[in-house]
């Protein structure tokens, strides 16, 4: 019986990154006009000073396309060269057709396949691992990864416990072939005992049947999520380094999920991240954008020129599930004309 013929395996890396940040920047002072709080309390507890909130015309598709165009330009890849589009989002209310198809079509990537995934704050790292596998297996040459979120659509702005944390935005990356390993193995995991720690207040079908339950909105046990992040995410980050053959001292950058700066600082401390490593603190003026947060932070880091192209970085996303995913990667060179 004949066997299957498969392409020769190769290496992959991130060729380019891009992002889109909504026009409207909302300060803590403005947030305090809709919740009973103070600017000082919010910044002290979270490190967040402002966040971006999308206007009605800044849909998840619009933001995703804009981020993708910047990533394609940075990578020097034409949309027609994209073989696969993977979109991560938890805030797409149109479940069919797939958002990936709409984004690919608007970009002119009509030769591509595409699908969406939903893994909350870990979504971008999951999507990047799929892209790397697709390139390394020979199934695709160029893969576009997009993470796009309107978190303000799924929160109650009057909820004093979490409305100040979240923002909107999109990030993207183009993955392609490489002469050397450029994306490390993904480390992923779940803790189903934490299902109730970060969840929706009700389902949409419950809301349709009985509007008195209220529009579905995020509910979070912040203390439980914080304890889990320290207990589970830190070992996962160490494992992601180990399987890539790196130590924390080898890194030039650390790009964690931008939950808030307090959690980031604890992760940095527990991991023993040296002072020479640049740590992304994008949440300070972007807020928590769920799956888009790592992508947004990565784009800002690369375009800042603060780290060398080709240097190793560690990314890890974590949140609802509870779940996490992370990997090491070699950073792309900054764009020749930073924007």
Curated annotation (Swiss-Prot):
**EC id:** 2.3.1.180, 2.3.1.300
Membrane-spanning residues where? none
Which UniProt keywords are listed? Acyltransferase, Cytoplasm, Fatty acid biosynthesis, Fatty acid metabolism, Lipid biosynthesis, Lipid metabolism, Multifunctional enzyme, Transferase
Keyword Protein biosynthesis annotated = no
Q: Record's SUPFAM superfamilies?
A: Thiolase-like
Q: Which reaction does it catalyse?
A: malonyl-[ACP] + propanoyl-CoA + H(+) = 3-oxopentanoyl-[ACP] + CO2 + CoA; 2-methylpropanoyl-CoA + malonyl-[ACP] + H(+) = 4-methyl-3-oxopentanoyl-[ACP] + CO2 + CoA; malonyl-[ACP] + acetyl-CoA + H(+) = 3-oxobutanoyl-[ACP] + CO2 + CoA; butanoyl-CoA + malonyl-[ACP] + H(+) = 3-oxohexanoyl-[ACP] + CO2 + CoA
**Where is it found, in Gene Ontology cellular component terms?**
cytoplasm
According to its UniProt record, this protein's enzyme class is transferase
Q: Which domain of life is it from?
A: Bacteria
For this entry, list what GO says about its biological process. fatty acid biosynthetic process; secondary metabolite biosynthetic process
Domain notes for this protein: The last Arg residue of the ACP-binding site is essential for the weak association between ACP/AcpP and FabH.
Q: What does this protein do?
A: Catalyzes the condensation reaction of fatty acid synthesis by the addition to an acyl acceptor of two carbons from malonyl-ACP. Catalyzes the first condensation reaction which initiates fatty acid synthesis and may therefore play a role in governing the total rate of fatty acid production. Possesses both acetoacetyl-ACP synthase and acetyl transacylase activities. Propionyl-CoA and isobutyryl-CoA were the two most preferred substrates, although acetyl-CoA and butyryl-CoA could also be accepted and elongated. Involved in the biosynthesis of R1128 polyketide.
The text of the family note is: Belongs to the thiolase-like superfamily. FabH family.
Please give the name of this protein. Answer: Beta-ketoacyl-[acyl-carrier-protein] synthase III
**Protein species of origin:** Streptomyces lividans
């Amino acid at each position: 019986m004949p066997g299957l013929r498969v392409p020769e395996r190769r290496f992959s890396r991130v060729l380019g990154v891009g992002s889109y940040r909504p026009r409207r920047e909302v300060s803590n002072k403005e947030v305090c006009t809709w919740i009973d709080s103070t600017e000082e309390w919010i910044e002290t507890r979270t490190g967040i000073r402002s966040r971006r909130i999308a206007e009605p015309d800044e849909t998840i598709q619009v933001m995703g396309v804009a981020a993708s165009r910047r990533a394609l330009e940075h990578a020097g890849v034409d949309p027609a060269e994209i073989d696969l589009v993977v979109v991560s989002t938890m805030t797409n209310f149109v479940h069919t057709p797939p958002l990936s198809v709409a984004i690919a079509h608007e970009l002119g990537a009509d030769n591509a396949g595409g699908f969406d995934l939903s893994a909350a704050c870990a979504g971008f790292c999951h999507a990047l691992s799929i892209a790397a596998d697709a390139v390394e297996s020979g199934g695709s040459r160029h893969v576009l990864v997009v993470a796009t979120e309107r978190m303000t659509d799924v929160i109650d702005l009057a909820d004093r416990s979490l409305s100040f944390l979240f923002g909107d935005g999109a990030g993207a990356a183009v993955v392609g072939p490489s002469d050397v390993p450029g994306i490390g193995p993904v480390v992923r995991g779940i803790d189903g005992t934490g299902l109730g720690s970060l969840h929706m207040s009700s389902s949409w079908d419950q809301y349709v049947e009985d509007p008195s339950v209220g529009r579905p909105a995020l509910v979070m046990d912040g203390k439980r999520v914080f304890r889990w992040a320290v207990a589970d995410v830190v070992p996962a980050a160490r494992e992601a380094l180990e399987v890539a053959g790196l130590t924390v001292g080898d890194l030039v950058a650390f790009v964690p999920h931008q939950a808030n700066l307090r959690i980031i600082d604890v992760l940095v401390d527990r991991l023993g991240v040296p002072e020479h490593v640049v740590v992304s603190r994008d949440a300070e003026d972007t807020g928590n954008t769920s799956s888009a947060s790592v992508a947004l932070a990565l784009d800002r880091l690369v375009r800042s020129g603060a780290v060398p192209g080709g240097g190793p970085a560690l990314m890890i996303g974590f949140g609802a599930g509870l779940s996490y995913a992370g990997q090491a990667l070699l950073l792309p060179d900054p764009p020749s004309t930073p924007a």
